[in-house]
């Protein structure tokens, strides 16, 4: 598959940084899809549908493998989105203090030549330390995680919020499960290590 171009259907700088770890040249495109949850759709169904939709929405003129990814954070059965501002971030972290939350990340690789899409879901659990309001405010003011699901950056100071992490790939928390991606690329004929 040397003639296949790798494309990341995302403008997220976090996902781009993760994909760079694989040392494969890639380009990025902004996906064009409606991210509104469907009525009755589970978190798992939502992230899988959106990952596939993002990958398939990119119009490519050459043979490419297009990567789509989507992530939601679930606490007490409710999907928690990005906070977008300081007040919401503080409220989210206050609700998560001493709790366990689950991240579901949908991942899809679309082959623009064959039309085939391979996809999977990765689950990652985060157990928060009991946090004081002062700790939460200090963290939010220092790291400003306004565009991160769950209101934290696990790759930064956010690690101080956690008691325990459970999952097969810590990259999942940042939004791109690389272990699963390596497998999906291999299923499409692209070997990361050659």
Swiss-Prot record:
Kindly list the residues the record flags as site (Important for substrate specificity): 14, 71, 155
Q: What is its main location?
A: cytoplasm
Keywords assigned by UniProt, alphabetized: Cytoplasm, Hydrolase, Nucleotide metabolism
Cofactor entry: a divalent metal cation
Enumerate the Gene Ontology biological process terms: nucleotide metabolic process
GO cellular component, alphabetical, reads: cytoplasm
Question: Keyword Hydrolase: yes or no?
Answer: yes
Top EC class for this record: hydrolase
Any idea of its EC number? 3.6.1.-
Q: List the catalytic residues.
A: 70
Q: Which compartments is it annotated to reside in? A: Cytoplasm
Q: Which domain of life is it from?
A: Bacteria
- Spell out the molecular function terms from Gene Ontology: nucleoside triphosphate diphosphatase activity
Which transformation does this protein catalyse, written as a reaction?
A: N(7)-methyl-GTP + H2O = N(7)-methyl-GMP + diphosphate + H(+)
| Family to which the UniProt record says this protein belongs | Belongs to the Maf family. YceF subfamily.
Described function: Nucleoside triphosphate pyrophosphatase that hydrolyzes 7-methyl-GTP (m(7)GTP). May have a dual role in cell division arrest and in preventing the incorporation of modified nucleotides into cellular nucleic acids.
This protein is called 7-methyl-GTP pyrophosphatase
What organism, scientifically named, is this protein from? Vibrio vulnificus (strain CMCP6)
